[in-house]
Structures are given as structure tokens and as C-alpha cells.
Amino acid sequence: MQLRNGKGAMIMNVDKICGQLTVDEKIRLLGGVGDWHTYDCNGKIPSVMMTDGPHGIRKLEQEKVGDIETSKPATCFPTASAIACSWNPELVKKMGEAIAKEAKKEQISMVLGCGINIKRSPLCGRNFEYFSEDPYLTGKLATGYIEGVQSLGIGTSLKHYAVNSQETRRMTSNSQIDERTLREIYLPAFEETVKKAKPTSVMASYNRINGKFAARNKYLLTDILRKEWKYQGGV
């Protein structure tokens, strides 16, 4: 398997690199170093540094597991709920470009955003991070954001896939949903953004969907995301 950039040039021969890794190194690839880095396999694979970033980067001053309160100074852009009022994908794209410039300066590889959960309840504690209750508007703005960030070579993580519209018990809640509602409300924004902007990665949500956790939901991650939408990025 060959990993290529957006222009078709090969940047990594995955099979060759995997053949050089020990079993221990392969296992350590499944986890991280602290909360924000991937393991570099003793220098064989560049470490990926991630940071939160829907409306500005949050690089920690010091790397401590669970510590998210000591971020370095960075621009705080309007939240998704605020900038969505512009109805302007090009403006959101420019914001993405500005975030990417700050990420490059801090040697950040990937911004964990944008978040496109559909707003179904005003009680959701993270509604400010999401664009809208409208799947159409959300898809247009998310595409602009992803294209803006990735235009400068910084990766993105489209989140949270899927049917995650509450924070209360989000790790264990079970979103029971029929196919029509899933297709008409919760998936359109993801589908448009995945197909048009091709985000570097897609972040699975924590909740269960019809009894199955999103992170191991074959219907969502394989049947729809991989096979139907032809997504080839990381999950």
C-alpha cells in the first residue's frame, strides 16, 4: 500500500515501513504518547502531534496526561455557532487557513476539528462548537473549514461520527435511530465534507448507535464511510 499526497506523489510506502517494525512497535502504534502524540517507532515513523482546534489551536505548555488547562497563547476565533451565522463558506475557509498557520508555527501535525454534530437539544454542553441544526449549512461550512486548514498541509479530524448530540453520559448513551432520520439529518453533513474536502481523518463518537458503539460500528465505519463514500483517510 502506498500513501500519496493530494498531488499524487508517494510520501510513504506503508508495506515497506510495516515490514521494518517490531511487534512491540506495531502494538505501540495503537496508542499514543501522552494525550497528544503518536509513537515514532524509534524514529522510523514521524510522530504526529495533535491539538484541539475547532476555533483555534490548544497546544499545551507542558505534556501531562489529562492536563488541558495550560495551553500556549493562540488566537481564539469565533466559535462554530457564531461563524455559522455568516452563511459564508469562504470566510470559514479563511479562518481554517489562519488556524493552520498557527499550527505550523507550533509544529502541530493535525487539528482535531471541525465538529459537525447536529444540534438537536439546547442542553448539549458543546453546541457552541457545532455549526447548526441544518445539515446543509453544516456541510458547506465544514467543507470550507477542512479545505482551509489542509491547504497549508495541516491535517484535520472531522468529528464526531455520528449521532452525538448530547454531552450527558456521552460515553455510554445509546442513540436509537431509524434509517431515514440517520440519512436525512445526521449523515448528510459528514457525507458532503468527506467527499468534497477529504479530511485527513474522521473521529468516531463515543456513544452507541442502536446498541453498538460508534468506534466499532461496522455499518457506519465500513459499510457507509469506506464502501459507500469511498473514504480512504484515517479513522
List each model region and its residues:
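Glycoside hydrolase catalytic-domain context in secreted enzymes
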Residues: Q2-V235
